[in-house]
Every structure is written in structure tokens, then in C-alpha cells.
Amino acid sequence: MSTPSIDRGFKADVLASALPWLKQLHGKIVVVKYGGNAMTDDVLKAAFAADMVFLRNCGIHPVVVHGGGPQISAMLKRLGIEGDFKGGFRVTTPEVLDVARMVLFGQVGRELVNLINAHGPYAVGVTGEDAQLFTAVRRNVTVDGVATDIGLVGDVEHVNAGSLLDLIAAGRIPVVSTIAPDADGVVHNINADTAAAALAEALGAEKLVMLTDVEGLYTDWPDRTSLVSEIDTGALTQLLPKLESGMVPKIEACLRAVNGGVPSAHVIDGRVEHCVLVELFTDEGTGTKVVAQ
């Protein structure tokens, strides 16, 4: 008879310890970039969807921006289309863009919307094309010191946040696919990390949370003792040139968000069930927190 009592007491302590964070975040917007392994494991997908519903029912306003790299790569392979990456970004030809557009909104976004809506009529899927949410501008990247064209890859030039604010006010959870036109109507694929940062800034979010496939930010990867729990934007800017190429878009996104007025950005391990709740509602958190200098 003692074990259930201990279990109940432990659960009560966990819930009670979350109270300060629930109060701090009540009524605030939290932008979550959903990607990596959390998008490919069925248990993690279900846990993430439940986390978003939990936030919503606690009076917090989650906005999900999702990637789809593994799914796009799988579809390109299935169709016999060559794929390439430069500087951490997918090289996007018109043919690749058609596949990305189909997979992001038609497959990945739909699946997440359905997982969330298994808990109630909450999620609404949108793309950067809807209500002119994003206006893109062509992006080049620097690879080994050389400016490199990566095709129809865009950065976010402008965010028209009104449509998402309307959804939030209606109690919905926006699920955003990052395809968007430029000023001339040419559609681009926007890196989901980049889009999440721009959206967090435009929405006046309290936090930007980035799911990854590592425990957080390592200052000297692969030395696992170099994991940092908190870092400011000044130190992070100095560290940026030394990072692995796959981490660069995520760290650039954190810097953009925090420099744009978002109080904190968080790089967390999406391979852990309920990682978003652990990061937001515990003192210890998980991963790396980025704050202003």
C-alpha cells in the first residue's frame, strides 16, 4: 500500500514545482520548432502532440513550426531525385521544391495536425503562403568562405502575423509549414529554424524552443563534457564559426530570436519524451538556454 502513496506524492511534487513556470507563461506565446527524431518516432510524435495540447489547456499559446528533412529526403530518394546540402541547407531546385511543398504541408503537417486533434479540435495547419504569412527573399550561404547559391531557399523578409494571432485568439494551435513566396510570387523553401525565429520575433513570443537530435549545444563537439546549460548571445556569436554545419541554422535562429526581443531560446533534445514540458516546467530543464548578453 505504501508504493502508490509514494508515487502520488512524487507526482504531486512534480506538479507543484511547475506552478511558478505555469504562472510565468500563462497567456504567453511559445514558438516550438518541431524536427529531427521527434518527427520520425511514433512514441515521440504522440508525446509531442500531447505536450502541445497540455500547453494550450494551461493557458499557454503554442505555435508549432515544423521541418521535414528526413521525409523530404525519403520522398526524393523514392522518386529518384538527387538531393544535396551546402552549409547546412538543402539545395532546392524547382523539382526539389515541388517535393518539399507536397511533403511539408501534405504529409508532415497533416500528420501533426491529426495527432493534436486526437485530443480535441485544436490544431490548424497553415503554410507561409496562407494569408501572406511569410514573404521570402532568396538566400545564399557561405561555405568555406565562399558565397554559395542553394537554389529556391529563402530567408524570411516579412511576417504578417495577423492570421496566426487570430487563430491563437480562437484557442487554436497553428501548425506552420515553411513554404513561402517572395515579393514576385516565386515560392521558396524556408529553413524551419529560420522561420521559427522570425515568427517568434514577430509574434512577441516569450520563448523559442528548438527540438534537435542532441542534448543541447556543445562548445567543443564531440566532447560531451562541453555541453552548456545556458549561454548569452555574445558568447554564442563568438562560438558560431566553430560549430558543426548542421547546428549553425539552429544557433543562428536562436540569435535572431533573442536579438529580436524574445527573452530566451532553448535548444533541447527531441529524442526525450515530453522534452518540451521538462524544459519549460522544471528548474533543471533540458538542453541549452540562450539569453541576451
Swiss-Prot record:
Gene3D superfamilies named among the record's database cross-references: Acetylglutamate kinase-like
Keyword entries, A-Z: Amino-acid biosynthesis, Arginine biosynthesis, ATP-binding, Cytoplasm, Kinase, Nucleotide-binding, Transferase
Pfam family, one: AA_kinase
Binding positions (substrate): 68-69, 90, 189
Pathway terms, separated by semicolons: Amino-acid biosynthesis; L-arginine biosynthesis; N(2)-acetyl-L-ornithine from L-glutamate: step 2/4
Enzyme Commission number(s): 2.7.2.8
Residues the record marks as site: Transition state stabilizer: 33, 250
GO biological process: arginine biosynthetic process via ornithine; L-arginine biosynthetic process
GO molecular function: acetylglutamate kinase activity; ATP binding
SUPFAM superfamilies in alphabetical order: Carbamate kinase-like
Residues of the signal peptide: none
Top-level class of the enzyme under EC nomenclature: transferase
Entry GO CC: cytoplasm
Subcellular location per the Swiss-Prot or TrEMBL entry: Cytoplasm
Reactions listed under catalytic activity: N-acetyl-L-glutamate + ATP = N-acetyl-L-glutamyl 5-phosphate + ADP
Xref: HAMAP family: ArgB (MF_00082)
Function: Catalyzes the ATP-dependent phosphorylation of N-acetyl-L-glutamate.
Family membership: Belongs to the acetylglutamate kinase family. ArgB subfamily.
NCBIfam families, per database record: argB
Stated name of the protein: Acetylglutamate kinase
Organism from which the protein derives: Mycolicibacterium smegmatis (strain ATCC 700084 / mc(2)155) (Mycobacterium smegmatis)
Gene behind the chain: argB
